[in-house]
Amino acid sequence: MQYRLGVAGCLFALSLILSGPVAAADSTQTERVVPEVRATRVNSRSPVIDGNLDDPIWSDPGLDLARNFTQRDPDEGEAETESTVVAVTYDDDALYVAFWCYDSEPEKIRRQLVRRDRSSESDLVVVRLDPYHDHQTGNQFYISAAGVLMDGRIFDDTRTDGSWNGVWEGAARIHPWGWAAEYRIPYHCLRFTESGEHVWGVNFSREVNHKEEVTWWSFAPASESGLTAHYGHLTGLKGIKPATHLEILPYAVSSAEIGNETEANRDGREALGNVGVDVKYGLASNLTLDATINPDFGQVELDAPVLNLSAFETWFPERRPFFIEGSDLYETPFSLFYSRRVGRPPSGSVDDDLSDYTLDRPDATSILGAAKITGKLSGGTSVALLNAVTEEESETYMTTEGETREAVVEPIANYSAFRIKQDVLQNSHVGGLFTLVSQDTYHPAVTGGVDWRLFTNNGVWNFSGQTVFSRVDKEDIGFGVSANFAKASGRHLRGAIDLTIKDPNLQINRLGYTSRNDYREIGGWFMYRTQDNWWIFRNTWNQCSFHSGWNYAGDDIYRRGNINSYFELTNFWSVGYSVNIQTEKYSDLETRGNGLWEWPVHPTWSGGTFLITDRRHKLSFDTNINSGSDRGGSWWANYVGVEYRPRSNLEFEAGADYHRTFNGTRWLDNDDDDHAIFADLDKDEISLHLTASVMLHRNLSWQLSGQGLISTLDYRDIKRYTGDNTYVRDINAEDYADYNGTFS
């Protein structure tokens, strides 16, 4: 134990030494002049968005030009090495932006053609707007040198949501002197209040890919927190009004499933189809209505396959467009709104002693309809209201008497979530989130909470957290608290301490997500980082953390520490490592409701290392190797991923992940006498994914993707747990033979 702690400590100390000389002070604030650019009104013909920049307005001698960009990377604070000039014009309908990106080596301009909203190894420019000028929210618009568009929303000053898709125009073109980008951003893409003359927050940035150089017009060092808080000012916008808009997005999906032959499906094949529509309508300049009928589940089917042997529910990311857009408003420390609950797989089962086998069971609950209203009102108040109705779902099954029957496995349900958030102080907010689930055969489930995120005036320190409650039956009310105090900025030193409390009655999983209740945890982390080139390093991050947790009975169920380091090298490769220690003695969930289980061996250790090559090359790869002890056994895992781009419009990706577990003691089942049955598990698991993409045009692509998972389980030494880390081996192994095998 002491030897391993010493090794880990020496490794972390060596990482700090390799990070370069320690600064004498951790200065976080600099005096800065806020830059300003004036937009020029188009009084004649508006620009044609083609990247040529030959429209009369772009040669107007009265244009106010934004120039003199500053490096954010690699040489922070230094002047740009390639000149960039930006101009802004506008008319009654839209904002127009032009970039002149001069390059001394135009033959090295990178132009990878990919699908919209996908990052690539390309030169690019970005326009970031804060129309409310609240220093908290906004939109960002990217154009690559290949003309590929990306966009997203910005919230809470620094957080981004790439799921937002605006209807705007952009084009890029290569010129002998470099390349140009041209924007048309209609006002209906933006949310702002009416005013005689507007002042918006704005920033422009550029990335020169072959130099890995990122420059900002309105510069702020990486040591200072904030994104929108450091924007410059866009002035001169007079006589413009927010525009209403209507978008209708119909869809049709067809698919086929091929599997094993069953009694219900004699040939193992099934053809499926689905249609629906999404609608977006601007109710006002700052409120938008989104509605959907039978939302697209096509993207949900791309969830990575998982074999979950733990006591915790698998969390899946949201992929449906209706639920993705604007989801940032519902993000709070406690996940009271987990949108994958809406339309989830049916959770009920057939309660019929005569049931023989299933003929048909829906994979998901049908959403009859859903609608939401989102926006930001005057005074800095953001609101979001969502309501969805799901259909009753039934399973068709065959009885032992040869009769076909149906049973309800998911009652009809109504889901509601209401969010309100108020800007306060300097780049801070307080808010509330409330949810309600009404479903036949269940008592209405109500949850709610108040959250906050408060910064000091200089943006260095912040205090954030949330208090929540839940009531899912007539009697028990649960509560929870999350609090975090952090040093959010600083050139070298950052860190935080945090506290989490979830009482035994806290139940938020009807519409939210939590891995457990009956839990109290305290912990913290510390990080030392560098961003100056030193020796072979460009950037380094060195972090250590420790957290301890107990249930309300006082049992020690979570005590873990970690040290990790990340090094970005001057050749743009990245390497790093992590070391973890787990010292808790008990688990109160492993027996699935049958008391405490003592870990066979404690403490346990794990560690790993990774390597990522320069993704700008045609061929790149990343790999990681991890190993450790766990549950009285050991394990190791390895991942290898490869990307190959033979041409700018052609890309192949492949990855393989292999995981091997030896002699790990795991819960298997509970017997009729409520005793937990355990066994030693040997597990081999391999997962694969492959994607091929061809871009025929920047707005037309063809993609083929596949993924798979194969797991082999071998349970041995089956035994009954009697407590105090002792077992009775009086189990007939043949009774559990079906648990072994290969699963895919």
Ranges and model annotations:
Residues 1-5:
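N-terminal secretory signal peptides that target proteins for export/translocation
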Residues 8-19:
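Bacterial N-terminal signal peptides
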Residues 24-422, 431-432, 442:
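Structural preference for beta-rich elements and adjacent junctions enriched in aromatics
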Residues 93-95, 137, 179, 196-200, ...:
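Outer-envelope beta-barrel architecture signal
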Residues 186-194, 226-241, 283-287, 326-330, ...:
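Outer-membrane beta-barrel proteins
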Residues 221-241, 393-458, 487, 573-618, ...:
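Outer-membrane beta-barrel transmembrane domain signature of Gram-negative proteins
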Residues 242-290, 415-471, 532-535, 540-546, ...:
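Surface-exposed extracellular loop regions of Gram-negative outer-membrane beta-barrel proteins
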